[in-house]
Amino acid sequence: MRVLSATLLAGAASAAAPPFQQVLGAHKEYAENVIQQGADAFKPLQHLQDQFKSLSGEARQLWEEVSNYFPESMESAPLLSLPKKHTRRPDSHWDYHVSGAEVQDIWVSGAEGTKEREVDGRLEAYNLRAKKVDPSALGIDPGVKQYSGYLDDDENDKHLFYWFFESRNDPKNDPVVLWLNGGPGCSSLTGLFMELGPSSIDSKIKPVYNDFSWNNNASVIFLDQPINVGYSYSGGSVSDTVAAGKDVYALLTLFFKQFPEYATQDFHIAGESYAGHYIPVMASEILSHKKRNINLKSVLIGNGLTDGLTQYGYYRPMACGEGGYPAVLDESTCQSMDNSLSRCQSMIQACYNSESPWVCVPASIYCNNAMLGPYQRTGQNVYDIRGKCEDESNLCYKGMGYVSEYLGQESVREAVGAEVDGYDSCNFDINRNFLFNGDWFKPYHRLVPGLLEQIPVLIYAGDADFICNWLGNKAWSEALEWPGQKEFASAELEDLKIVQNEHVGKKIGQIKSHGNFTFMRIYGGGHMVPMDQPESGLEFFNRWIGGEWF
């Protein structure tokens, strides 16, 4: 979860007592409902003031109360994101074209001899473009095969950019991983160049080889989503998570159709921050299609926002010295945060019950102002409790500015086929639109029990992060209702040690696991674990995709 607006995210943190949680027992029904929403998800927020007039008295009173507390936040509600300037490249620029309509029209003989589609899903609106990227032209992982391109939905004018890096090791057998950054509204190319990709960008705006890249033993796809993030673009807007699920299913289906040499390998989805929203939806969408060419084996969520009702109860403990690091706030501020917690949790609970923007938006604004503000006003880095925010214009990290400058260069955009006129690491408008559509506190954690029935789920958390801290991630994973809840919650944290290199035996964190569910605490990692602890990050990643814990 990137904090993109000090106005929206100023507040208090919360108490150590575990909050109550309503979990929908019929998680399969919930998953089906979420997936069905995808058809209506590509609709920007419109006519907010007109709709406000039709609210019930109680809902209107809540909005007016929050508006009085935080007028600048509420004034942002009617605004929409502007389309990105772009120039579509001619078909001759691309090496490969895949038509979703043609893929959907492939029929095969079923088990009983009847004709059936080779793959499920509505793909007719989608097309995939791809080109070979010359590694030597960019100086990024020379000798490693790379593809980049766009998933196009021309009906809705959506164009999602991706960049694929083949495994450095054994690409014919190594797994494939989709990586997603959060925000909402932040480019996954920041994850590529700041965290786990084959290169970082130095202060001279030059690529530097990354020995700890996750493509050491896996092929990795970095996807800029939702639309109007990074190199992706659209003439419209998007304001919630469910649309992404169908887009990602289409992207993967068409990509593996064009490049079948990767389709039989194990496939995993990994991401951080607001990807704690994205990943349960995307994985549920994939698993809902019985006939698919996507060999989904697991998901990994790092320092994610997944269950706000539980997680917001752990801002006060983390800020006040109970997360393993010295307190950032004084005793009186910690007490005021305790005092705000019950109101915040009751508002989130109401959002969980209704999932209405008119309930969820006030909850988001109140809780973000009440739960995050005291910490944020100290100037401390919300992504790393150990230091100050060094560059407010780049979300506290100078390196993000280097990445933006590099990816904005015309030569780089030409090399990867980017069609936008520039590059921004994060789109503040998308962040605001998601919040004002009520997506922030939607209970997407209710999809996780359905995932656990079919695939392993890893929740990992760097223990120096504040914004999506390890205390809250541990708490929600233990509170989740699923058949193995009791055994998982009661399991003790055990030492996580390096086993694969010269530092064998070094403690890098703690782990607990039962059935298909695993939680990891990574020592010394902030919001971006692979950046802060590259050795530890690659260690647990390699062992996870190798199947050690499932």
UniProtKB/Swiss-Prot annotation:
Glycosylation positions in this chain: 217, 516
Propeptide cleavage-removed residue intervals: 18-131
Active site: 273, 465, 527
UniProtKB keywords: Carboxypeptidase, Disulfide bond, Glycoprotein, Hydrolase, Protease, Signal, Vacuole, Zymogen
Principal location class: other
GO molecular function: serine-type carboxypeptidase activity
Alphabetical GO biological process terms: antibiotic biosynthetic process; monocarboxylic acid biosynthetic process; proteolysis
Catalytic activity: Release of a C-terminal amino acid with broad specificity
Cell compartments where the protein resides: Vacuole
Intrachain disulfide bonds: 186-426, 320-334, 344-367, 351-360, 389-396
Signal peptide span: 1-17
Coiled-coil annotated spans: none
InterPro entries the record matches: AB_hydrolase_fold (IPR029058), Peptidase_S10 (IPR001563), Propeptide_carboxypepY (IPR008442), Ser_caboxypep_ser_AS (IPR018202)
GO terms for cellular component: fungal-type vacuole
Enzyme Commission number(s) of this protein: 3.4.16.5
Family: Belongs to the peptidase S10 family.
PANTHER family (UniProt xref): SERINE CARBOXYPEPTIDASE CTSA-4.1 (PTHR11802:SF113), SERINE PROTEASE FAMILY S10 SERINE CARBOXYPEPTIDASE (PTHR11802)
Stated role: Vacuolar carboxypeptidase involved in degradation of small peptides. Digests preferentially peptides containing an aliphatic or hydrophobic residue in P1' position, as well as methionine, leucine or phenylalanine in P1 position of ester substrate.
Protein name: Carboxypeptidase Y homolog A
Organism annotation: Penicillium rubens (strain ATCC 28089 / DSM 1075 / NRRL 1951 / Wisconsin 54-1255)
